[in-house]
Amino acid sequence: MSTNGDNHQVKDSLEQLRCHFTWELFIEDDEMPDLENRVLDQIEFLDTKYNVGIHNLLAYVKHLKGQNEEALKSLKEAEDLMQKEHANQASVRSLVTWSNFAWVYYHMGRLAEAQAYLDKVENICKKPSNPFRYRMECPEIDCEEGWALLKCGGKNYERAKACFEKALEGDHENPEFSTGYAISAYRLDGFKLATKGYRQFSLLPLRQAVSLNPDNGYLKVLLALKLQDNGQEAEGEKYLEEALANMSSQTYVFRYAAKFYRRKGSVDKALELLKKALQETPTSVLLHHQIGLCYKAQMIQIKEATKGQPRGQNREKIDKMIRLAIFHFESAVENKPTFEVAHLDLARMYIEAGNHRKAEETFQKLLCMKPVVEETMQDIHLQYARFQEFQKKSEINAIIHYLKAIKIEQTSFIRDKSINSLKKLVLKKLQRNALDLESLSLLGFVYKLKGNMNEALEYYERALRLAADFENSVRQGP
């Protein structure tokens, strides 16, 4: 029977390890089902040479769910894969798996087995150049940490990129390190699309990763999307066709190829690919969201073709597109309640359906969220302000939320839209009442934000004079 002293001694040793239990992977409880689904999908459908890490992550997720026996099975699979995939460097590559074994056994109260794995780690770390007893600084472990962070969501992407950068310092031409760095760069670029002045940087890393991994269809389709972002759609389509011709990782390739086609305007082709992928991964949050966006795009196409006046069959088609989009957006947020962008798309689609009650409920959920990206919160306030202005006819609430969007000082196109929307609303109010003190002050504020200081001073002075006149009239009485 173990003593408390043994327990503390083992725990102190465990804290020194480099593994999923010590990497501070930020995973919310309501994100766990989606994370587990994505991990299982990757194991089954992503053809990659880098599968050991994903089994380690699955073990960690199983542990968090209280399924330690299942966690041990996943670690055993990781250990077996290590022998097949990295036999020449299995000892160093096994450090993360052995460290996770030690932690799981510790949590199960099996201290002797935990200590046995600690001993295995210590034996590998015994090098004259290594000052640590239970840890080793090496690019392979930096890479494993990067993969784990990358899989655990947007709040971890910067740290993931830093891990892959550190790994590449030790081996510039390593295909796996290059792949991880390129994917983390691509994800970070996606976060910053709305940021004014942001210089996207993933194109060169993606080109480098594709050159080092010429058979990787997943990387090629990401490169195709990035080229499309940069206005190089023709070159992007060449990589896309290569990815689609390759049988590897087809479920993943279909997801991103569909995005390429949707943005190109080939919505039917996009839907065809997404439905094929959905047959393989029916709970995929990304797929449901992308399908919803396709139906939204089809709705917009019909509206534009009918100049916003759809009748008869066109009206029926639009109603069908709205229902289908709502179904898929609802599926996305059901499987991942923290998916802010899908919630926002769902709220807008409820508005299209005329279901203001559901739209309000969805916006209230959104207003309680804490998105990783500030621009997302700006967009939540902007869209809610528009809902209040145009559907609920509440100018007061609209102004409040335009101001809340503007108050988030991250420079972005969304913030600019919020400023312009506030200006339009205030000018409309002043047309009805040129002596509206609040509107005069707000217009001065808008011009100040735009850098038009002369106009700002003019409206501030008019507001001050109006306030002074009002105060004098109150003093003088009737």
Swiss-Prot record:
Segments annotated as TPR repeats: 52-85, 95-128, 139-174, 183-216, 218-249, 251-284, 305-339, 340-373, 378-412, 437-470
GO annotation terms (biological process): defense response to virus; innate immune response; response to virus
Binding residue positions for mRNA: W147
Keyword Lipid metabolism: no
Residues noted as binding RNA in the record, renumbered to the chain: G190, K259, H289, Q290, K336
InterPro entries documented for this protein: TPR-like_helical_dom_sf (IPR011990), TPR_2 (IPR013105), TPR_rpt (IPR019734)
Pfam families: TPR_12 (PF13424), TPR_16 (PF13432), TPR_19 (PF14559), TPR_2 (PF07719)
Main location group: cytoplasm
Alphabetized UniProt keyword annotations: Antiviral defense, Cytoplasm, Immunity, Innate immunity, Phosphoprotein, Repeat, RNA-binding, TPR repeat, Ubl conjugation
Subcellular location: Cytoplasm
Molecular function as annotated in GO: RNA binding; RNA sequestering activity
Family per record: Belongs to the IFIT family.
Protein's name according to its UniProt entry: Antiviral innate immune response effector IFIT1
Gene symbol of the encoding locus: IFIT1
